[in-house]
């Protein structure tokens, strides 16, 4: 008779090792069937395509969870330094295909769905984008998570689980109309709620100073409920966690006010607390000082820091003493990266916890805080910098205001000692801005409270040092770094452009997918006839596929032999979609003037969302659609010029349009685009760039050779010189007849016959207060576009430049970016250790 099992032996049977993985197609089919019937409770007679998508998602998720659990066990045992990436935005897009790619499951799932009479691509299209971001900043966070997992870093993304992400954009009569993005309506198969880790977050209240320390009393409490999403690395069995917080009212919310006789009212008012995580603020590069937004910023910070400290205290080697109350080793075990100033409250909040709660003395606490935090700056536009009214802090976060005052006082004392009598320097460097309304400058707080400050492209990091934080750079030059942005080659090549990935793998193997610098090997193939043919063929296939999609979605017929000229990004004056518009009009006028001439046919695609309150951006969209209405219906033009506004541009649409693009427009005024990452995606996918010397364009030109991009326009120095001299738009308007004609057409109502005054604000801005100097670059831009046309006529030479660009895009992998953060800011080394898969023993 078998000896009875001990409790511990019985418990050992509860193990991920006991669960079969998805080895083959038959397994996938079996698991799919099981989920359709047992998870979704449907049979084939009533199942909808959405049910089939969910069944497949659960099937793929099953393959993740064993690795996810294993990864977390592995971190607990090894106790590495943990990286916490704090961001108010994570623009993840869809998850299914990315998970299949990173786990190497795509072939098995493709075959299994085919055998079940389903089309994998159709199922993938059912998934909602997780649109928890506005644009570049949120998408960067998503790429970074992918790279951190692929590099085996013990990293966590922390943010907010917005119930409504970035709005869906509809175009109605040429105008943008916003619709709520109810992305969770059908449920989210990738997230796991973790109510056992729910944490309280405090607001309002008052501060009391006692002999035993400082108390923050009479606060309103909101609960933060974590939802975890797995983040798989590429084929390394590492699965990290993105933890997003959702706001919940406590059960006694408003009921503890004994004077509230209305129980129903009190329960209904729970919504007020839960509104904190209701919706993403749709502003890109613009600060709108709303109290709800400040609440969101503190909410994510307060919940996350409690979580970080809980994990630090319970980690195996978190501290030397048994009760783990010593925070000496905190910066050796924890790195906090602030994605812009939005999570800046991490600095005073960590101070509050250390000083008020953990009773660490101020100077020690400040040293710990500085060593732990690092800050990434993402913009130089003054209207984007966060400057919160002191009065709002006083009410919402009274203790944090005191702490910020104390931080500022010590900081200013230090500056005054180094620069005696320089009162203006003190004013410039203060965290508190005096004036009609006292404000807190969050960027200054971040610089003071961090051990590293970085810009996101070399030119931007120079501007940060020479201009934005000049005084701070003089104080602590060693603190400032550059970390040029990057993109994940898994999503932005392998997933979105399998045709291109395949012909590259055939030539140089697949090592480039985790070491993108290997693309350099393609340089030897620049003159290889077969490779030139293959690259051109893949591009043509992508264009045909995208054309078919456009026809299906928007009912527009386009010429797939035309040059696909693509300008997709948030709509903003500094990104200069208006410069593109002027080129389109100029091209149109040239065709009309000389219709017999042979023009290179173009399809110009412009896409992007405008912040709902940004009047000029909305006018720009209306102008693009109005130009399209005229150009696309002019029989003289035919299919030589088409203008398409790509509605509801988002991650999943980017994955379709970028592989089909011939020309990538990156035309911001020099010195305004911190880096840009769309530029990198186009480069990697075989489009050529027309752009200014701004952001990462500068480094792209350096990597590929300036002669392999179409660079035009003012450099940063020229823009500064023009500012000194005084920019006079009228000068250019008078001197350039084609520009004058285009502007006059806009202002006379040529593109808005039913409302001739429609664009008067746009013309008035361009003529009298254009901060971004559109006219100053018009002439150079038009000439540069003519060069584009000339090269495009010679398909072979064009494709050779494409190959050179792809071969030189290796620097722009987020793996390279994250490796630099790891070594130079966080003090950790990437690891190529393969965690054993769940069906094998740990060692």
UniProtKB/Swiss-Prot annotation:
Residues that coordinate or bind pyridoxal 5'-phosphate: 569
PROSITE patterns found in the cross-reference section: PHOSPHORYLASE
InterPro entries: Glycg_phsphrylas, Glyco_trans_35, Pyridoxal_P_attach_site
Cofactor list: pyridoxal 5'-phosphate
Residue list for modification N-acetylalanine: 2
Residues marked Involved in the association of subunits (site): 109, 143
EC number(s) reported in the record: 2.4.1.1
Residues making up the signal peptide according to the UniProt record: none
Positions carrying Phosphoserine: 15, 524
Region (Pyridoxal 5'-phosphate): 677-678
Keywords: Acetylation, Allosteric enzyme, Carbohydrate metabolism, Glycogen metabolism, Glycosyltransferase, Phosphoprotein, Pyridoxal phosphate, Transferase
Full protein name: Glycogen phosphorylase, brain form
Gene: Pygb
